Curated annotation (Swiss-Prot):
Protein's organism: Rattus norvegicus
Task of the protein: Plays an essential role in hormone and neurotransmitter calcium-dependent exocytosis and endocytosis. Part of the SNARE (Soluble NSF Attachment Receptor) complex composed of SNAP25, STX1A and VAMP2 which mediates the fusion of synaptic vesicles with the presynaptic plasma membrane. STX1A and SNAP25 are localized on the plasma membrane while VAMP2 resides in synaptic vesicles. The pairing of the three SNAREs from the N-terminal SNARE motifs to the C-terminal anchors leads to the formation of the SNARE complex, which brings membranes into close proximity and results in final fusion.
GO CC, alphabetical: acrosomal vesicle; actomyosin; axon; endomembrane system; glutamatergic synapse; membrane; neuron projection; nuclear membrane
Post-translational modification: Phosphorylated by CK2. Phosphorylation at Ser-188 by DAPK1 significantly decreases its interaction with STXBP1.
Protein name, entry field: Syntaxin-1A
Tissues showing expression: Expressed predominantly in cerebral cortex, hippocampus, cerebellum, adrenal medulla and retina with weak expression detected in non-neuronal tissues.
Protein topology in the membrane: Single-pass type IV membrane protein
Major location (coarse): membrane
Family, as annotated: Belongs to the syntaxin family.
Biased composition (Basic and acidic residues): 1-13
InterPro entries in the cross-refs: SNARE, Syntaxin, Syntaxin/epimorphin_CS, Syntaxin_N, T_SNARE_dom
Name of the gene: Stx1a
Site ((Microbial infection) Cleavage): 253-254
PANTHER family named among the record's database cross-references: SYNTAXIN, SYNTAXIN-1A
Length: 288
């Protein structure tokens, strides 16, 4: 009969090598994934920093009736940079999402997949939060520009309601603001100049909001759909922590009780020994 021991040993070694290869490939994949996570987090942090700088530029522009061109150019550069970086983040998050969906479609479930889903959800939420802050910043700036236009119109003697002013802004025609204004003083001319400046800022702002709207809604819907899953994970983690804390507490109590029992046992043994010595001495005295 042919000895197959060596053949079986060779086959086992080959299987072991395959397992090692799969493990190494998986570890390398997760290392690359975490590098990507850090890159995305860095992009989101960069957007957050730019949003704060945008707020400062808004305040500087509103503080001057005729802001200098350099400040306005710097604001446009910041807005452009935010848009480019946001598109990068969205693209990378989409790529991770598709990768996760492919594995779920194959009914694969692993610790690595759960980690990737959690990281993707966390990054998506953080991204939507920073973009929500940017959107709120833009909306606030629009309202402040609108308020300045309304005040300048009042200076020229023209009173408008908020709804009327909104209709004028939506028309996109700057000439509509000059209608009915008598240009007989430098005050009226200066007021109209600021009105045109603020109107121009609002138009740029609305274009920026429009460009980012679809992306923002897409990511917001994604995060909303993930909300229940994240809440469930957080619930499980919290209960796991409570369970561990109770287990540690119970263990400490058990150790404490065990220690007390051990001390009692030792004391009983010592008492028995002493009692034995006393009895032995007494008996010895009687018969001695």
């Amino acid at each position: 009969m042919k000895d197959r021991t060596q053949e079986l040993r060779t086959a086992k070694d080959s299987d072991d090598d395959d397992d090692v290869t799969v493990t190494v490939d998986r570890d390398r994949f997760m290392d690359e994934f975490f590098e990507q996570v850090e890159e995305i987090r860095g992009f989101i942090d960069k957007i957050a920093e730019n949003v704060e700088e945008v707020k400062r530029k808004h305040s500087a522009i509103l503080a001057s009736p005729n802001p200098d061109e350099k400040t306005k150019e710097e604001l446009e550069e910041l807005m452009s940079d935010i848009k480019k970086t946001a598109n990068k983040v969205r693209s990378k998050l989409k790529s991770i999402e598709q990768s996760i969906e492919q594995e779920e479609g194959l009914n694969r479930s692993s610790a690595d997949l759960r980690i990737r889903k959690t990281q993707h959800s966390t990054l998506s939420r953080k991204f939507v939060e920073v973009m929500s802050e940017y959107n709120a910043t833009q909306s606030d700036y629009r309202e402040r520009c609108k308020g300045r236009i309304q005040r300048q119109l009042e200076i020229t003697g023209r009173t408008t309601t908020s709804e009327e002013l909104e209709d004028m802004l939506e028309s996109g025609n700057p000439a509509i603001f000059a209608s009915g204004i008598i240009m007989d003083s430098s005050i009226s001319k200066q007021a109209l100049s600021e009105i045109e400046t603020r109107h121009s800022e609002i138009i740029k702002l609305e274009n920026s909001i429009r460009e980012l709207h679809d992306m923002f809604m897409d990511m917001a819907m994604l995060v909303e759909s993930q909300g229940e899953m994240i809440d469930r994970i957080e619930y499980n983690v919290e209960h796991a922590v409570d369970y561990v804390e109770r287990a540690v507490s119970d263990t400490k109590k058990a150790v404490k009780y065990q220690s007390k029992a051990r001390r009692k046992k030792i004391m009983i043994i010592i008492c028995c020994v002493i009692l034995g010595i006393i009895i032995a001495s007494t008996i010895g005295g009687i018969f001695g």
